[in-house]
């Protein structure tokens, strides 16, 4: 067994099949800010609301842990357009952009949502998966 981690993994399954997952955790050196590290949905079921429901579940989990701010970092490239749309339609704002962060022409974009100001969305029932260190 490795050391304990602050990462939280949640997995959504239908009929035993993994349809999506998220990974999030507290942002180091902050009090109440969390990072969404990963969100992934099976390509065959994208567009069915699973991404929104997983985001809502993360928001609930963060608030249950006394968190109030959720940050998501992503790329500015066209291949991440669907992810950016998911965040924006979920009430996240692009608060910062760092030009050429990943490489020339690929900028880091930081999306943020204040969970104390946002209305509650419907969350999915998901399985908790222990972090692997």
Indicate residue ranges for each PLM-predicted region:
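Short hydrophobic/aromatic beta-strand or adjacent loop that forms the aromatic wall/cage
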Residues: 7, 106-110
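Residue-level signal for beta-strand positions within conserved beta-sheet cores that form or flank
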Residues: 32, 68, 107
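Conserved GNAT acetyl-CoA-binding A-motif
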Residues: 62-76
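Acetyl-CoA-dependent GNAT
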Residues: 1-44, 52-57, 61, 65, ...
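Conserved active-site alpha-helix within GNAT-family acetyltransferase domains
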Residues: 52, 76-96, 103-106
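Residue-level signal for secondary-structure boundary sites
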Residues: 80, 118-121
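Flexible nucleotide-binding loop
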Residues: 48
